[in-house]
Amino acid sequence: SIIPWEDAIPSGPKVGIVEINAPITSSKKAVEDLNYFNRKSNIVAIVVRLETPGGGVAASQEIYEKVRKISQTSHKPIIASMGGVAASGGYYIALGADTIMANPGTATGSIGVIMSYPIVGDLIDKMGIQYTTIKSGILKDSGSPFKDITKEERAYFQGLIDDLHNQF
């Protein structure tokens, strides 16, 4: 016979588990899961399982803020459980929890911000391909792979990276 999934799980107190087990590119699923478990009266604690090298700054910030808010406003304990890797944004998310659990071998920390892009201008020139850029501002084509970076662009990007790093 087939037993519906909900009927197969005994009633009573439960622990909600939010899994973040890949590079962090979006906060949507984790925040939805956190909200769901926070609303459910039969969920008595929330575990955020982290197995991630980190990822996007904005997505990591959004998850961290939700974890921290639940920690500060809910009676439910929220526990960060680190797997083999919980680095950068994963570490940041864990900081919002009431408790952080890690194994001695967990690779964690590594707070930093990186930006890179290829510069293919010479290759394009060798192929005989020409390109034109029309822009509305001096930095609008910053980061274009078709040209070398200028001193002004490097300073702009370094400031951006430093600002994002300081938000950690």
Predicted regions and their residues:
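Small-residue-centered hinge/linker elements
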Residues: S1-P77, V85-F168
